[in-house]
Amino acid sequence: MTDLTAQEPAWQTRDHLDDPVIGELRNRFGPDAFTVQATRTGVPVVWIKREQLLEVGDFLKKLPKPYVMLFDLHGMDERLRTHREGLPAADFSVFYHLISIDRNRDIMLKVALAENDLHVPTFTKLFPNANWYERETWDLFGITFDGHPNLRRIMMPQTWKGHPLRKDYPARATEFSPFELTKAKQDLEMEALTFKPEEWGMKRGTENEDFMFLNLGPNHPSAHGAFRIVLQLDGEEIVDCVPDIGYHHRGAEKMGERQSWHSYIPYTDRIEYLGGCVNEMPYVLAVEKLAGITVPDRVNVIRVMLSELFRINSHLLYISTFIQDVGAMTPVFFAFTDRQKIYDLVEAITGFRMHPAWFRIGGVAHDLPRGWDRLLREFLDWMPKRLASYEKAALQNTILKGRSQGVAAYGAKEALEWGTTGAGLRATGIDFDVRKARPYSGYENFDFEIPVGGGVSDCYTRVMLKVEELRQSLRILEQCLNNMPEGPFKADHPLTTPPPKERTLQHIETLITHFLQVSWGPVMPANESFQMIEATKGINSYYLTSDGSTMSYRTRIRTPSYAHLQQIPAAIRGSLVSDLIVYLGSIDFVMSDVDR
């Protein structure tokens, strides 16, 4: 893979004209076929004509060292954006983020659209996982994807009026009329939830027998949240299924347009509510790219330490609940004892437990307290023995292996087609962990390994990779404990928010800055930035657009759970209902991460 650690600082504005893919595109389509946008995303951003979209996408997919994964796809309302110098005229735009694993490089394609012609060809013919992303973009922006197999709402109820991420759509409850749920409206909403197989291209039966359609969820305990799957069954065999999401949708991306850069940090904790500080990492790193902030080494190590603590915390819950889904109850109670020790440590450091909101733009909220090292030492002495007991008592159990090995299995090709990341991707033999492939927050300075599977990702392999990931996280924590740098816990930068307290008590200028940044929020330079990280469940990323304001113009959150749930039908067809329960337990998802 290409060494990304030797590049310029992440916050440099670059057009990436030196990236080989730009030359390959120009050789194929001509030197004037595209507009290349300079950003702080760290990714080549290329505006293309709508008519070229499918041809360019197909070209990139067939290159030597191809762009094999559609990582993200979404839209933007450009109508109120003032800083668009050098960009094609657009009322709306759609972007396509592609990844080449072999190159360890990305490219972002953008298509400009006029308000009176919001049509673009579907990308599902090239990448099947474009399905949900296009549905969501239509749902929230009203952009139509011609040729889409079933373009319907996915986040909002089917009866919803309007497209919430448009700039002319209200962002506050006080801008709406008071909500009333009449009997007639309740009946309408219930009718809208009725599943009609024909709408999904499903048959109600064959010549000899009828299929049964079964609702699993949205309140089934094995659905792991407000999640509904409609199963088309031939006896116990799953002929097909339709995942139904959106019940946990909170409008997190819309909130990003009404909160200051600083005050949005608590919202990031709640995107994937088990990840804690892991969720804060991509957001603050993306904002720091916009601001041009380089944080001290101590900040990097503290952030890594908190992230790995939350990774262990999340993995323990995942492993124990998976074992519970298969039928063994005891490990989940042991795991909560271990997780309690992590929460005690996190609370001692941050003051909070599940949702610390502790990372800051330019640093962390405060320095490590006295005694943090003793608490971490006690945990590191405790956890390895417990992990070994889980493996011996439950994960090596013959019954558990028989229930999970070979279930919901897929290979590398399928994983890449569906945008699978994290342990699900690495189980197929693809060695791609962002902490190693594209180090951030100083991960390149840590000695740890990436567990990789043998070529097939099944339920058992995914779980066992997470067990090994726990051990690697313990290795990282040991290094944090032994090599914590001295130095400040905030960067000395005008946009560090809030600025160091001692400065505000001595200088009127910094006191004014503190007042403005806390009351109105810091003003970030107009630009775009992007940051992906290896979160607890796969790759999580924030793509931020600043228009030179105290708030984000567009906050795009790409979560791993969303992509993983879209893959369910492809992985489970032909299996039994009982296998689906095991598969759901092996995915590692929470619905807040899916629905945002």
From Swiss-Prot:
It catalyses: a quinone + NADH + 5 H(+)(in) = a quinol + NAD(+) + 4 H(+)(out). Its main location: membrane. The keyword Ligase does not apply. It comes from the Bacteria. GO terms for molecular function: NAD binding; NADH dehydrogenase (ubiquinone) activity; NADH:ubiquinone reductase (non-electrogenic) activity; quinone binding. It is found in: Cell inner membrane. This is NADH-quinone oxidoreductase subunit C/D. It comes from Shigella flexneri serotype 5b (strain 8401). The lineage of its organism: Bacteria, Pseudomonadati, Pseudomonadota, Gammaproteobacteria, Enterobacterales. The gene is nuoC.
